[in-house]
Amino acid sequence: MPELPEVETIVRSLEKHLSGLVITSVDLFKPEVIRTPRVDIFTDQIVGRQFQKKLGRRGKYLLLHMSDGLTLVIHLRMTGRLIYCDADLPLEKHTHVIFHLDNGKQLRFADVRRFGRMSLVPTREVPHLPGIKEMGPEPLDTAFSREYLKKELRRRRTRIKSLLLDQCFVAGLGNIYADEALHEAKIHPERLAPDLTSREASGLHKAIIEVISSGIKHRGTTFRDYVDGEGRSGSYQHQLKVYNREGLPCPHCGKPIQRIKVAGRSSYYCSSCQKAK
């Protein structure tokens, strides 16, 4: 699933192309992709709308702001792609929506797993949408402070890996960047959140910011499905220390990376650097 760095990269790559363009028509091959409003209303409302200069993101949601106070809200889920391209580019097999633009180009939404969803809503309602209104702070915002992190760790008696995946705690983290942050902070993924020391919490806070920033710098992580809004792969997969590296040597100590299940999710870690305690 695209996480914060991937979604941020998509937003930035689309922003430079979509600004000022108008949607002239829509091809909708999978109506179930549209969450709200009703499909016929969605099509009627979005045709003729112009993309604003500044697009946005909240957690893993893309926010494509449009004229007349509307925003196209998109969650890519596991395998969604949103690509700006030439109209004559061969169609991907799992293309579900095509937005035709007034410069002759297209914005295409494709999704192999078919879990991705989009909604067209008044911009003022975006902060109140289910899935967004409950979100915690963005990891690169000042609201995600060391003090916030330490306070939340004390009051949530759950495994730290599970907590990092909770979007109500911090927005945008997923399996990849949670594992990388825990490794950087030398914290075992099964440690209980309130058991972390003040020093460990500070180290985790720093690690989260560093891995997210690095993920954005390298334009996200590509294994199979993820590409940005121009169809380009990311490169953060070449920077990974533990994620998806089971059996390979830890770059810090040389011990083999291990994989365990935490809350039903695969977690990669180094048993030497990240002690269970």
Curated annotation (Swiss-Prot):
Involved in base excision repair of DNA damaged by oxidation or by mutagenic agents. Acts as a DNA glycosylase that recognizes and removes damaged bases. Has a preference for oxidized purines, such as 7,8-dihydro-8-oxoguanine (8-oxoG). Has AP (apurinic/apyrimidinic) lyase activity and introduces nicks in the DNA strand. Cleaves the DNA backbone by beta-delta elimination to generate a single-strand break at the site of the removed base with both 3'- and 5'-phosphates. One of its GO terms (biological process) is base-excision repair. This is Formamidopyrimidine-DNA glycosylase. The active site is at residues 2-3, 60, 265. Belongs to the FPG family. It holds the Pfam family zf-FPG_IleRS. Monomer. Gene3D superfamilies: 1.10.8.50, MutM-like, N-terminal (3.20.190.10). The gene is mutM. A zinc finger (FPG-type) spans 241-275. GO terms for molecular function: 8-oxo-7,8-dihydroguanine DNA N-glycosylase activity; class I DNA-(apurinic or apyrimidinic site) endonuclease activity; damaged DNA binding; zinc ion binding. Its EC number is 3.2.2.23, 4.2.99.18.
